[in-house]
Swiss-Prot record:
Protein name per its UniProtKB record: Urease subunit beta
Primary localisation category: cytoplasm
Annotated localization: Cytoplasm
GO process terms (BP): urea catabolic process
Organism: Helicobacter pylori (strain Shi470)
Cofactor(s) the record lists: Ni cation
Active site: 322
Positions annotated to bind Ni(2+) 1: 136, 138, 219, 362
Urease domain ranges (all copies): 131-569
Enzyme class: hydrolase
Residues where Ni(2+) 2 binds: 219, 248, 274
Gene: ureB
Known catalytic reactions: urea + 2 H2O + H(+) = hydrogencarbonate + 2 NH4(+)
Length: 569
């Protein structure tokens, strides 16, 4: 058999086992752990290549043949970093491994059969990840949705009704009528969407009604009064309906301190938003809850990574988002109590330790909806530069750290909100919501986004050009965005109760409607690569953070990766 160099092989078929790939301009190095494509039997589409009739394509139509095959993709997922063909059928991932013609090639499984009905997409030299999941969305403006989508986010969870003051401050779609309105509005968009209802009520019936109206969970927010009673009632109802509860705790400690909140939670599972505290929560020590076994702790992206500009920009953001007035002394003091460089500095380190499990945006409400993925990788790179390789790494690579940070915006938010059966990873049986990246632009600018197995967004050149590549090249909506195709390619998530009562038919929804499940039987230990529990303390005078008795902190960066260099044009 003829042999070629690794360099030649990588240029033709992409990197193989043992090859290493740098992610963007970071210091993060991914090493290919395994190659499933079988040397000498690789698929390659094009003139004079192998993906042709009678060769790697079967002549015989069959019920197993794929709708689409992505060839020679480098998959970066919590399940591994490996090379494979990805087969897509009926909008789902049908197979991962060696694709082709099982009549002519070894190692081809039925679920990766290429036939006359199969489209091809060349994945050689590209990285494929699952679509991102942002679980902290203020639905203030619909323009957020395409912005997030272009960044690689394919699922948005949160609440709101537009630029009302309640939505500007809280991720809540309150009440049956507002939920109906937003569920219908969601029909328009290329994005999986789920809505959170108002959890601030010491009345089980009002909470239950919202869940039965289609909410996938409850959000408790201090601007509506995060009292121990509201916390207890929301969790009681959530346990009954198997939905998640997200919380923004009481910054002013009016209804109780962090210990009172934990007592009200009483060991039940809770998704805590911006657990560091700059986005809101018990001052100065809400960060303590991140180490508890029943807490699923999240960060929002304004505070990660910690930079020389982080503290300064937060004051104006906070005043606007929470309807505060700089001329009122008490409002300024409220804002000051939330912005603590010491706890922000600790947040980056807690991410690197796997104590913080999720990253999200806090869109237009102290967060940037299009930067969840970028800032997650900037944080990973900042931590590697400051602290070096993780002790868990094996070999000369950063695979463990890469899986840890990828999980924060893919599989872990999916698990937290009961949608991991459908999305959140590159696994057989899951919806084919996939993001394709050039390694040089990883984490910043996707090449292409596949939604429900169909291309929804791509970098595309001049439509009047003779080929697809002439300038200007920029993101353009593809066919999955249009007509009734968008109904097949996207999902509206609802509660099991609403699903069972036929909410799709009741509201005349045309998109796929699927129920959330297994939200209440999870703990921190279910957070992939981010399941560390610890005893966390905050010095009430200095705000320094201690984990199991040892102070944790990080330095503010004056330069980050994946930044202006990638946004020149």
């Amino acid at each position: 058999m003829k042999k070629i160099s690794r360099k030649e092989y990588a240029s033709m078929y992409g990197p193989t086992t043992g090859d290493k790939v740098r992610l963007g301009d970071t210091d993060l190095i991914a090493e290919v752990e395994h190659d499933y494509t079988i040397y000498g039997e690789e698929l390659k589409f094009g003139g004079g290549k192998t993906l042709r009739e009678g060769m790697s394509q079967s002549n015989n139509p069959s019920k197993e043949e794929l709708d689409l095959i992505i060839t020679n993709a480098l998959i970066v997922d919590y399940t591994g970093i490996y090379k494979a063909d990805i087969g897509i059928k009926d909008g789902k991932i049908a197979g991962i491994g060696k694709g082709g013609n099982k009549d002519m090639q070894d190692g081809v499984k039925n679920n990766l059969s290429v036939g006359p009905a199969t489209e091809a997409l060349a994945g050689e030299g590209l990285i494929v990840t699952a679509g991102g999941i942002d679980t902290h969305i203020h639905f203030i403006s619909p323009q957020q949705i395409p912005t997030a989508f272009a960044s690689g986010v394919t699922t948005m969870i949160g609440g709101g009704t537009g630029p009302a003051d309640g939505t500007n401050a809280t991720t809540i779609t309150p009440g049956r009528r507002n939920l109906k309105f937003m569920l219908r509005a969601a029909e328009e968009y290329s994005m999986n969407i789920g809505f959170l209802a108002k959890g601030n009520a010491s009345n089980d019936a009002s909470l239950a009604d919202q869940i039965e109206a289609g909410a996938i969970g409850l959000k408790i927010h201090e601007d509506w009064g995060t009292t121990p009673s509201a916390i207890n009632h929301a969790l009681d109802v959530a346990d009954k309906y198997d939905v998640q509860v997200a919380i923004h705790t009481d910054t002013l400690n009016e209804a109780g301190c962090v210990e009172d909140t934990m007592a009200a939670i009483a060991g039940r599972t809770m998704h805590t938003y911006h657990t560091e505290g700059a986005g809101g929560g018990h001052a100065p020590d809400i960060i303590k809850v991140a180490g508890e076994h029943n807490i699923l702790p999240a960060s929002t992206n304004p505070t990660i990574p910690f930079t020389v500009n982080t503290e300064a920009e937060h004051m104006d953001m906070l005043m606007v988002c929470h309807h505060l007035d700089k001329s009122i002394k008490e409002d300024v003091q409220f804002a000051d109590s939330r912005i603590r460089p010491q706890t922000i500095a600790a947040e980056d380190t807690l991410h690197d330790m796997g104590i913080f499990s999720i990253t999200s945006s806090d869109s237009q409400a102290m967060g940037r909806v299009g930067e969840v993925i970028t800032r997650t990788w900037q944080t990973a790179d900042k931590n590697k530069k400051e602290f070096g390789r993780l002790k868990e790494e094996k070999g000369d690579n950063d695979n463990f750290r890469i899986k840890r940070y990828l999980s924060k915006y893919t599989i872990n938010p999916a698990i937290a909100h009961g949608i991991s059966e459908y999305v959140g990873s590159v696994e057989v049986g899951k919806v084919a919501d996939l993001v394709l990246w050039s390694p040089a632009f990883f984490g910043v600018k996707p090449n292409m986004i596949i939604k429900g197995g169909f291309i929804a967004l791509s970098q595309m050149g001049d439509a009047n050009a003779s080929i697809p590549t002439p300038q200007p090249v920029y993101y353009r909506e593809m066919f999955a965005h249009h007509g009734k195709a968008k109904y097949d390619a996207n999902i509206t998530f609802v509660s099991q109760a609403a699903y069972d009562k036929g909410i799709k038919e009741e509201l005349g929804l045309e998109r796929q409607v699927l129920p959330v499940k297994n939200c209440r039987n999870i703990t921190k230990k279910d957070m992939q690569f981010n399941d560390t529990t610890a005893h966390i303390e905050v010095n009430s005078e200095t705000y320094h953070v201690f984990v199991d008795g040892k102070e944790v902190t990080s330095k503010p960066a004056n330069k980050v990766s994946l930044a202006q260099l990638f946004s020149i044009f």
